[in-house]
């Protein structure tokens, strides 16, 4: 496979996909991907409960939703923030408690081999400057588990903001990564 990209919860799938090495990947972007918790089971269960309650609070309260994700920042230009947030609030209410619990549990508690498969994949881990503290354990995990991975902090961005709110900038950055790694691989050949 030429390239793989995973963002947030999808970014939780990509480290496992790469670690197993069943399908060779030349380059990969893990965009604020969630890595497995490295703590005792009881603490992982408490973390899952915290995440679940946080999601439910946001899903039940429009005021909390707009406080955590201000519409003026998280609405695409030219779109009506009221309509966008009405649709988002309605959508968030469609998730069952069990679905939310399963999403958070599986994103934070997947197993990985002791060492990732050797495949020569060029890996970069992207995260927003404003989410650096929240991603701290993920960044440490990536540096330890994939020691050759490059870390890339995106200025003035929060979680998933680049891909959701700035698609042209996302495209430019992803193409830069793909063409830069291609050029580097061609030089080695």
Where are these regions (language model features)?
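Acidic catalytic loop of the alpha/beta-hydrolase fold
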Residues: 129-134
